[in-house]
């Protein structure tokens, strides 16, 4: 996967955040049990640096285009420092640190691996658009005309596509790949292209 991802390029940079698969919990432990979440993260940071990516770990960066600018923020995973009841030792989502130097007037895009953070992100009042993934619609979408059902509805109040509250938006990408069972039913791999236009 890293070889394919390394071809991604952008004139304004490629930005990333940590997700649950980056912590190494789904890999078989080495015989000496040294492949810890911290070791997995160090390895991933090195790989991303070699690819020219910028990891946003409770940090924000301004992108300027002429007289205009937007701020891209990225928050850490997991939200509370625990994954499935296990402490990662890598901290968690810290919105105060993330938005420390972000002006209220700036247009902000926040990247949060999990959409479960959105209520806190929205209440912080900085993010105009939040981009998330994680859910994969639980790898199952049943389509009935224009209606779609997924078991993700039982666990997540927001699980796929576009949501809005006032002037704040959340988009959840269905991603690609799988966990546990090697299939995706009606949940097609997704790459999302979002065009930003200035208000008229």
Question: Where are the regions that the model predicts?
Answer:
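Beta-strand-turn-beta hairpins that frame and shape the catalytic cleft
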Residues: 53-54, 60-74, 103-104, 164-169, ...
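Catalytic-adjacent loop/helix segments of enzymes that bind and process anionic phosphate/sulfate esters
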Residues: 65, 70-112
């Amino acid at each position: 996967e890293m070889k394919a991802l390394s071809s991604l390029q952008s004139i304004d940079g490629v930005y990333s955040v940590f997700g649950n698969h980056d912590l190494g919990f789904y890999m078989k432990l080495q015989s000496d049990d040294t492949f810890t979440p911290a070791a997995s993260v160090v390895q991933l940071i090195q790989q991303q640096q070699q690819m020219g990516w910028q990891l946003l770990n409770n940090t924000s960066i301004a992108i300027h285009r002429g007289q205009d600018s937007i701020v891209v923020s990225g928050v850490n995973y997991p939200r509370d420092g625990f994954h499935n009841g296990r402490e990662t030792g890598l901290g968690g989502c810290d919105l105060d640190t993330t938005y420390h130097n972000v002006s209220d007037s700036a247009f902000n895009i926040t990247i949060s691996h999990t959409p479960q953070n959105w209520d806190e992100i929205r209440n912080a009042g900085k993010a105009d658009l939040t981009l998330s993934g994680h859910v994969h619609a639980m790898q199952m979408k049943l389509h009935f005309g224009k209606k779609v059902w997924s078991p993700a509805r039982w666990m997540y109040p927001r699980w796929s596509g576009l949501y809005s509250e006032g002037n704040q938006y959340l988009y959840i990408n269905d991603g690609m790949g799988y966990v546990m069972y090697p299939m995706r039913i009606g949940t097609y791999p997704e790459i999302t292209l979002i065009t930003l236009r200035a208000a008229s």
